[in-house]
Amino acid sequence: MKTTLAALALAIATAAHAASPMAVRVLDWMLPVPANWTPQVPSSDMRVAQFTIKSEGGSADAAVFYFGQGSGGSVEENTQRWASQFLDDAGKPAKPRIEKGTTGGMPVTWVSLDGRYARGMGTGPQGEAKAKQSLRVAVIETDRGNLFFQLWGDEAAIARQFPLMKMVVSQMKRGA
């Protein structure tokens, strides 16, 4: 019973956040970003959008990366690089979970990783790895090149925010 009530409360909270999104332009697309995602000035030229996220269960961040048409590496190369930054509970490289889908007629590859994470730009851990971290990535194959939409942070926060990320990606629209 408690589990059912907790799941219901989480669903209601998620729906409440999703009910009042703000529109954010990313290149040619409008994204319906949840109200608890605070836009930030992108910290690098590779980021076309960046957010800090208030969430129960810890901290989270999101960013959309764009490297230009034909740049940024393949989905497979990036998945290998992201996986190299994670270790599982046994200290071995974490195995990514991969799902394929579409949004607005564009292919999307979803990559999920959990474990000890040392976020960085290169291959392998960069700095001190933090335990109980998650990374969710949607690689959206647009006609202008790939958009890399990343959500990362504490496992509990990402568990709450990932349904909202999926909503943002599924409802992105060209133009407007």
Region annotations inferred by a language model:
Residues 73-75, 121-122, 159-163:
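A short, polar/proline- and glycine-enriched secondary-structure boundary/capping micro-motif
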Residues 16-21:
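Boundary at the C-terminal end of the N-terminal hydrophobic targeting segment
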